Amino acid sequence: PILPQKWYFKNSIDYSISLNYAVLNYAARYKDELLYNIYTMGRHSIEAGSKDSWTLYPKRADALSELLKTEKPTGKIDSFQLAVFNKVYKNPVTRDPRGYIIPINQSTTAIQFVNILIKSGIKVHRASSDFMVGTKKYLSGSYIVKTNQAFRPHVLDMFEPQDHPNDFLYPGGPPVRPYDAAGWTPAFTMGIDFDRILEDFTGPFDALAYGDIQKPLGKIINSQYNSYGYTFSTKDNASYIAVNELLNAGEIVYKNKEQYFVRHSDKINNSITKLSTDYGILFTNVTTPLSDTLKKIQPIRIGLWDKYGGSMSSGWLRWIFEQYHFPFKLIYAKEIDSVNLNANYDV
């Protein structure tokens, strides 16, 4: 323990340096054991993903506790406890998946998710032709993530619900908040369509090289016909890039609940072709006016608060705006206090 005293930033730095030296010293002394343990963990993960396995989630521990309260022992207590344990932890329905399949026929966000997996060192396969798993057909180009790999725990974290224990201050009392992030699963938050496969499966799968970042393949459907205009989905995040690029170029963009629409012109045709190629956006050429009511989209004037020296929250929003090509202007306290913001900005 540290006695109460005047504290300087140097003290904190000294603590960090001493900790760094301790870690380096430990690694130097036990390098063989550390490297072998890393290998062993990877081997165990591969073995677990190659057979029926169950993760010991907190919810299953709770289910086991409840079952032990209601089940009555018959015979030896050890045999009874094992039988109850197997009811919960060896239930075939609750097995961990042998792998996940990400169908190719969905939005470009699925490719972004696949790239997250690739960047974190997860082995990903891609189907070279159509294939069947069970009774379901998957198209060529679909992505496959098997769990018989060294980073299996991370694979499960990317696809499975986060399961935190029910931690209460006292029985019947308020819950104790988790120390850190309590519930984010990228496959859920990104809205990815995927299937959990509980049985071992094979197919025409090609392993992607580590670091082989994927690019969505866009196209223009019905491009061979005379064009009245083009539609593209409101459900694809990449569509925001297309809308902002078109608006920034002075084009008129319309939308209804399901799709955006732009009228055909030689200039629009060139823009659509480039957007489809660069960002993998799927456009559909239409030959007649749409029957649905369309609303004209107005360009939006965004003012983004920031402070001199930078702000983490402002920087995050700025990064998001830049990724999807939203025009914005940084505003600081002086401007906020001295001008009519409503006259200069919409949001």
Predicted stretch roles:
Residues P1-V347:
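Intrinsic-disorder/low-complexity accessory segments
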